Design a protein with these regions (language model features):
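Glycine-rich phosphate/diphosphate-binding loop of Rossmann-like nucleotide-binding domains
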Residues: 13-25, 172-246
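N-terminal glycine-rich phosphate/adenylate-binding segment common to multiple enzyme folds
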Residues: 48-156, 270
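Gly-rich Lys/Arg/Thr-decorated short loops/hinges at beta-loop-alpha junctions or inter-strand turns
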Residues: 5, 146-179
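Flexible, glycine/charged-enriched surface loops at secondary-structure junctions
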Residues: 36-41, 201-209, 233-246, 341-353, ...
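Glycine-rich phosphate/nucleotide-binding loop
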Residues: 256-355, 359-363
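Conserved small/polar residues in nucleotide/adenosyl-binding loops
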Residues: 395-400
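Accessory "access/gating" subregions that flank catalytic or transport cores
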Residues: 207, 217-290
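N-terminal alpha-helical transmembrane segments of multi-pass membrane transport
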Residues: 4-6, 18-23, 28-52, 61-64
Length: 400
């Protein structure tokens, strides 16, 4: 059988621990037998990031800007415990944060729904997509510890050297401060990405901040969203029969819990980080969540929404069998291949991605799944299989 051809390579960003193992298994079992897979490979495993002083992460992001579509494996963001484990030169920053800053994109995360996995919130009958602003805020912050008796100030120096100062706090005891920033251009890009995504999906957009408390920082987000919606998207939304809705973040959380789903929830960077995990878990599993970073100029980076599955990796190193959910990592590959096929006018590649996703969902709905889903599934006739056996079943599936 002739393999499906590709015109333009995907940017492939390899990762860490158990997801790195699954990454290679997916390629070997499900992709290279069918596709003449073209990728420009970057090893974002922590060992290689340390060897290159994290330059490989920057290089992979720039390659993504060049080629337009990337697929990324989960990676370790090191903490203090990882320093001796990997003999790190320094505590390297999150690769995702670096890539998001370079691409200035918005992260859209959507749960993968399957029969037998009932959301913990029964009213959620349709998926909720979290749109996470991927630039700035706490992820590009500056922090200090302040000794007792010190004074902390915000200082902004304009291009003419004029300073504007505001006292943060006069510390009577030891304390801490944190400086955050964002850019109006990035917020505007975030707004447009959300509105364009909504028009494509024909879904409402909800946006929430805490502008009643943060009257300059958060209020600027609110104002930019409203201005862009009114000037550029209101007529398009009305024609499509969808809405843009703004509320406070605490009210949004209450509304989300009561809702049926089926909309895009736009969140600032930290809110999106937290709420995407909450939404994914409430729908069933972080390993059943798609994630795509979309830049304002149409660049796409697909990844799983979960981490490196450290506990399973340590079992794997001991030679023990694992039953690790590969669905989100697999859907990162299918999402990237479908987008590459769309951009390069390769319907066969797009159809392959569709069929592989269909085979995955049908296999789970037929009762065959990994351990995490086995514990959640309400199906009567269900079977737990190991990591590799699940992928091999997809290889032999009629849908694939």
């Amino acid at each position: 059988m002739a393999k499906i051809q590709m015109k333009t390579p995907l940017v492939e960003m390899d990762g860490d621990e158990m997801t790195r193992i699954i990454w290679q298994d997916i390629k070997d079992i499900l992709l290279t037998p069918y596709i003449d897979l073209k990728t420009e490979y970057y090893d974002l495993g922590l060992v290689h990031r340390n060897e290159t002083d994290d330059q490989v992460t920057v290089d992979s992001a720039n390659a993504t800007k060049k080629y337009g579509v990337a697929v990324k494996c989960a990676t370790i963001t090191p903490n203090a415990a990882r320093m001796p484990e990997y003999n790190l030169k320094e505590m390297w920053k999150s690769p995702n944060g670096t890539i998001r800053a370079i691409l200035d994109g918005t992260v859209f995360r959507t749960p993968i729904l399957v029969k037998g996995i009932t959301p913990y919130i029964p009213t959620w009958t349709k998926p909720i997509t979290i749109a996470r602003h991927a630039y700035g805020d706490v992820y590009k912050n500056v922090e200090m510890k302040c000794p007792a008796g010190s004074t902390a100030e915000l200082v902004c120096t304009d291009k003419d050297g004029k300073e504007t100062r505001e006292t943060i706090y006069n510390f009577e005891c030891d304390g801490i401060i944190q400086g955050q920033h964002n850019k109006s251009t990035s917020i505007a890009s975030f707004a447009r990405a959300c509105f364009n995504f909504a028009l494509d999906k024909k879904q409402d957009v909800w946006f929430a901040t805490k502008d009643t408390i943060s009257k300059k920082y958060d209020h600027t987000f609110k104002d930019i969203f409203q201005e862009i919606y009114d000037n550029e998207y209101k007529a398009k939304f009305e024609a499509a029969g969808i809405e843009y809705f703004y509320t406070l973040i605490d009210d949004a959380v209450a509304r989300v819990i009561r809702s049926n789903g089926g909309y895009i929830w736009a969140c600032k960077n930290y809110d999106g980080d937290v709420m995407s995990d909450m939404v994914a878990t409430a729908y069933g599993s972080l390993a059943m969540m798609t994630s795509v970073l979309v830049s304002p100029d149409g660049i796409y980076e697909y990844e799983a929404a979960h981490g490196t599955v450290q506990r399973h990796y340590y079992k794997h190193l001991k030679g023990e069998e694992t039953s690790t959910n590969s669905v989100a990592t697999l859907f990162a590959w299918t999402g990237a291949l479908r987008k590459r096929g769309e951009l390069d006018n390769l319907p066969e590649l797009m159809n392959f991605a569709d069929c592989l996703e269909k085979a995955t969902i049908e296999t789970i709905e037929d009762g065959v799944m990994t351990g995490d889903l086995y514990l959640l599934s309400t199906l009567e006739n269900k079977k737990k299989v190991n990591t590799v056996d699940f992928l091999c079943l997809l290889y032999t599936s009629d849908a694939a």
